[in-house]
């Protein structure tokens, strides 16, 4: 074996290194012979370590067929010959494919054979090969695989992109080239020129291999795109354009509209429907499903029926299996891969959270170093049963599944229920509100705890003496206070057997078996004021009377028994104990006239004016006053200027001028006396309980139009007179039980006739008060304990009201006719709702003494009562327009202005017909006007 020289070895090593570099940069050869030769060289790489193999290329591009082994002595001659050849001839052109194939074939034929060739020719061939390869690489756009370069020296799949030489390789090549002793100056200059051109040439910007990355080394496909500075600011924002405003005509800067990307900070990801967490059933009957952030309606999307949903799952693109319905918008939303993964894990009984570690290290709570024994109630590991599907839940689910398969449960049937009909039973679901279970069993009542008498050593006061023991034995079992005899024992062990034990157990069983039980719900009330109804403040219910404005003082301080106000509200008439009726001017409190109702009667028969009532019609101005055995009809001439006259009732005499008119020529007086000439019989009927008589001329000149004398001695004690709303009928009441059918008489003023609606009256029945219904032909008759409602047209009893009072004293009917207020001598006031029940709707007890009078206001929602305790109670009483609205009854104020004399206080009370004013009559001899 010939050993190469050191110079040739160095040059061969440098040439081999450069050849290896260039070989990696060669494009992939399409010639199969080339691939085979390269493979052969790769396989024989281990055998070429001792000798260096260089190929000498001839002028015609073919390789030499012989391999010469040269000694060290022949190197100089060979180098000289090569220098001469380089000076004479140009560097030949090399066919890369032919040279590679020939070399590979020679390597296959003679593996392991190595020959050293002329180093200068080899260097020139290597340089030419490299230049050709650079030209080919510049036009190539393929890359390379770095892993292949690292794994082998020769790679058939090497790419063209590795044009850049490593600086270390360049330095090594330059050192090896300069160390060659046979290198000519020309070859050195050429090599240096190539190296300088390689590093000083401008890279091709359009080359894909050089422009694949930016200055930061980031691929341009992944890096942020550069923006044009002509339309963008340095910070990236868009530049505005100056345009003239169409509204103001001024120049303004207009910016381009921002197109919000998916990852931009915008509101595109906010929910469209902004109604919040409210039941969506509220929008079932509406065309929209909610509202957006601007308040516009979010319309319901088109919904698919069951057939469309089925077709989507069969013929669709498969999205139906990965979609879910969004209740807030009504649309089908495609589930993300993460959400689908969670669903699959839940179906497979897996843990949805990948970050959760189900097999974390066990913590020993009781043993170990630095461990203090402690309870594991709060920190013990979870048992395995909590992570295993429940068998019982599986059974419940399968029960529902079987019911669905059998048709007993229809999914989605609740949404397809028919709408509630227009007319339905409002109490149909009343049983659903009953929270009690039908199978609930009430607990048995507990036995009473034993007392001191049942002790084996009871105190001496519980022991019976002989007399008590004898009485206990003689008494019946149900009359005994206790069913055993107390016995004293020295000790508990001396107590014998109880002989009645079996009997008591048997009776206990009978009680549990037969006795009915009732559950009483105990109210847990911390504040008793919560039980009181929430009433409106009296300040919100104004106006109502609160103060005294006018005092109508009667002479001699006699009691004012009664009073009444004319329909115009300008005049007030009162009746006193002295038997006189007085007319008052409401505004100034002046007494304008006075009449002695008992005039012409014996002194023994004189009495107080018990009742007085003004005719309710505004066509005539007259009133009636009641004394013992007489009813006086008075038409005061002082009030005729305020009365409306009727053309049919006014005669030619009364139609004269007011200067010549007298008390007997007024319209009211003529109306009261018009039927006297035609209806009054020549001889009074002895069987009639009433006699219509003409007053004296002196009385007629004062305005007294007619007297009604009660002929029946038993019915002479008249107490009440009441007018009908039309002003033609009035009724009188005698409360004596001996009056019989004459206790109630109805009189017709226009015909001067009187009659009793009751032909027969039960013995002992006494009528206390009477009022007419405001709109119907009914009368309310109050006895001592009951109120009966009669129909005068049908002559029948309609209803009987049970007051629950011991003695009824007064009553009044509401202007609507559906409510009644009743007062009694036992200090109670009852409100009746005639449409509700025969018993009181409300019972009030605010007075300390008997209630004398009660009255409703016809213009205001006010009611007042008078009592013997000297006070008046005001109430706000509002009645609902329909039957579903409850009564509102609110106490307003207590009026105190009358003195109590001889046990009597306020005797009568009346409301002003138009104003919220109140008139009261007291036993102190005064009548008061209460105003706001």
Curated annotation (Swiss-Prot):
Gene Ontology MF annotations: large ribosomal subunit rRNA binding; ribonucleoprotein complex binding
Biased composition (Polar residues): 27-36
Gene this chain is encoded by: ERB1
Region (Disordered): 1-229, 679-698
Biased composition (Low complexity): 1-18, 175-184
Keyword terms: Nucleus, Repeat, Ribosome biogenesis, rRNA processing, WD repeat
GO term, biological process aspect, one: maturation of 5.8S rRNA from tricistronic rRNA transcript (SSU-rRNA, 5.8S rRNA, LSU-rRNA)
Superkingdom classification of source: Eukaryota
Protein's name according to its UniProt entry: Ribosome biogenesis protein ERB1
Assembly with partners or alone: Component of the NOP7 complex, composed of ERB1, NOP7 and YTM1. The complex is held together by ERB1, which interacts with NOP7 via its N-terminal domain and with YTM1 via a high-affinity interaction between the seven-bladed beta-propeller domains of the 2 proteins. The NOP7 complex associates with the 66S pre-ribosome.
SUPFAM superfamilies according to UniProt: WD40 repeat-like
Entry function: Component of the NOP7 complex, which is required for maturation of the 25S and 5.8S ribosomal RNAs and formation of the 60S ribosome.
Main location: nucleus
Biased amino acid composition, Acidic residues: 57-119, 150-172
Entry-linked InterPro entries: BOP1/Erb1, BOP1_N_dom, WD40/YVTN_repeat-like_dom_sf, WD40_repeat_CS, WD40_repeat_dom_sf, WD40_rpt
SMART domains hit by this protein: BOP1NT (SM01035), WD40 (SM00320)
Keyword rRNA-binding: no
Any one annotated GO CC term: nucleoplasm
Location in the cell: Nucleus, Nucleolus; Nucleus, Nucleoplasm
